[in-house]
Every structure is written in structure tokens, then in C-alpha cells.
Amino acid sequence: MRIRPSPPKKPTPGLLHEYADRLVAFEYSASKGLKPHTLLFISGLGDGLGTVAYLEDIVAALEGSQWSVFSPVISSSYGGWGTSGLGRDTDEMARCIEYIQKYKEGSGVHETERKIVIMGHSTGSQDVLTYISSPNPRHPQPGLDPGHGHRHKRMPPLRPQVDGAIMQAPVSDRQAIQTVLEEGNERHSAKYMRKVVNDAIAYAKKHTYEDYDSLDTIIPLPITAAIGYPASTAVSSRRFLSLTSPDSPDSPGEDDLFSSDLTDERLRKTFGMVRHRGVLKDQKGLLVLYSGNDPSVPAFVDKEGLLRRWRWATDADEKRAYWHGESGIIPGATHTLEGPGQVEQRKELVRRVWMFLADVEGDPRTSCHSARPLS
């Protein structure tokens, strides 16, 4: 969970692509020529182009490889997350991947040999898991899809297959919010915060949609600002209930994918569906990187135990194991790995991503082994 983007560090060379109407993706590129393989990076709540600092390290490490890095702007980028949702995110990821596939036809590498890996940071990890585990195409949702509930509704697109998926800092928004409710914040006591959130939940449940479930309602800005969301960000009742997931763990919201108290049955319906959907092509194609010192994760969470449960749900059928060997906890890593105190942790993150991409590519003559991780 991260809702305040970092300031830009320095000018970054690359190409800006319009992959759909009014939606763009930035391709990090310091050299001419098409690279056949693609890492598509999806950032977290409040993030946008260039706001996740460690992405620069990944780009630098892959400079001499056959991989290019794309960072798309989607409807939920920056402040748009408050009225968007995972379904719309994955729709736009699908459109971006379709664009990239067509764009890279000129790379000289046959389509069957070109690789695409999706990587999510924070809430972007929810997008990644939803992309590879949900029905394809997904089911239409009220308030999110134009024409829902009407005869002439527009169906969500079919999502293209991907060769790999990376989740970095996959944390529970619900449990992060619960920590604030238990401790309060610099402005309000825990008692006041609990009242504000409970009132907001009651309002959102009572007034989730209007106009025959075709339009979202918006929670009053003073309420969401008191909780800690940016005062300028409108948050729909639908998205608020999804993030806070008040009926969890029995009936979790769409965004509640990574909480430590979720049942095995819930994990079978998310992680466990990866092997059934057929969207993630490669075995050993899922890399999960959990930060060892993430302030968004409550102290009571058993990180190692949580990862074991996720792996068990994903790889229950040992004949088709998707969990990659580089998955695990990055010791000492914070949520975003920003700052001078996180240099070693960023190196370790880049090393694991670098090794994973080399395995996905599978050709040592042209793979990431020709590039170099941070030294």
C-alpha cells in the first residue's frame, strides 16, 4: 500500500507509446533497435511514470540484454485508483500487451520466441495476480464496466498469455488500514479513526451504486482524507469496500488477496487458480518477492509462513510447479526500497529479477546473462 509518489529524479530517455485511446506507456530505451522481450511494470496506489525508484536499477541492469522495460499509465495511475479497480487495470494491461506484441513484430524474433513478463509493485501485485488467476475474460462488474446491467453492455477483453509474472511487496491494504485503526495517526486517535472508518463502511455499503448499479458513488472527501488518503483523491464506495474489505476473512473483497488471515479456500480461488486459467504459460513462471522490513505489514504477520501458504496454494499439483526458486523474503527491504540505506536490498531485488528473466528467456547466448546486475 503506497499512495504518495516520489518526485522525479532525473530525465530518462525512452519512447512514449499510445497503446489505447488516451492511455500511454513509456519504454525505457537508451539505444536504437527493438529488443524482442518485454518486462511490463505496474506500479502501486498513487504511483505513475518514474515514481518507483528501484525501476531505474532494473532498467540499468537490463540495458545490455534482450529485454526492454515498459511502464504504462493506466486509469488507476496517480489519483485514478480511487475510482478504478483491478478489473479495469487488467483490461488495460491486456490492451498494452496486445500493442507491444504488434509493435515488436519488427524485432526479427518470431512471435513464439518473444517473451512478456508482467511485474507489479505493491497494489500492482494485486493486478498481476488478478491477471493470471481470474476468469478470462473476466466477469463484468457494476460501476466499473460501461453498460453493466443493460442489453448493450461491452464485454471485457480476452487477456493475452504471459511468460512470467513478478509480485514485489504484495501486502494487505486491509491489514495496513487495521494497523492505523489500532494505533491512530499523527492527527487522530485510534478511537476517532475507528469511528470514521466504521461510518465510512456503513455509508459505502448503503450507497454503493446509483442509477441502476451503473454508476459509483463517492465517499465524502473529508472522510477519506481523515483516514489518510490524499485529500484530492476521490474514492468510490466500491473501491473503498474492496480495499478495506470489512467482511473479511469470511467474505473478502476483490483487493483482499494478500492478508495473512485469509482461509485456504480463499487462496485456492486466487493463487490456486493460476494453473487452471492458462494465462501464465511457463512453469516456474511466478516470482514473489516479499520485503523483510515492510512498514505496511503488521508485526504479527509470519512472513515465511505466509509465503509457504501461497506456494502451497499455487503448486498443489506438484507436476506443474509455478513458484520460482528465487521467490522469498528480501532481508531488510522496505516497501519501496528507497533511500541510501536500501542499496544492498535493491541489489538483491535486481539480482533476483535478473535471474528470473534469464530463466524465462531460457537461452544463455542471448539472455540476461549478457547483461549485468548491479555491482
From Swiss-Prot:
Molecular-function annotations in GO: hydrolase activity
Family statement: Belongs to the sidJ hydrolase family.
Role noted for this protein: Esterase; part of a cluster that mediates the biosynthesis of a yet undetermined secondary metabolite. With the HR-PKS AN6791, produces a pathway intermediate compound with molecular weight 258.
Transmembrane domains' residue ranges: none
Catalytic activity, EC: 3.1.-.-
Disordered: annotated segments: 138-158
Gene3D superfamilies per record: alpha/beta hydrolase
Keyword annotations from UniProtKB, A to Z: Hydrolase
PANTHER family for the chain: PUTATIVE (AFU_ORTHOLOGUE AFUA_7G00330)-RELATED, UPF0613 PROTEIN PB24D3.06C
Oligomeric and partner information: Homodimer.
Pathway: Secondary metabolite biosynthesis
UniProt protein name: Esterase AN6793
UniProt keyword ATP-binding present: no
The species this protein was found in: Emericella nidulans (strain FGSC A4 / ATCC 38163 / CBS 112.46 / NRRL 194 / M139) (Aspergillus nidulans)
Top class in the EC scheme: hydrolase
A family per Pfam: DUF1749
InterPro entries to which the protein is assigned, alphabetical: AB_hydrolase_fold (IPR029058), SidJ (IPR013744)
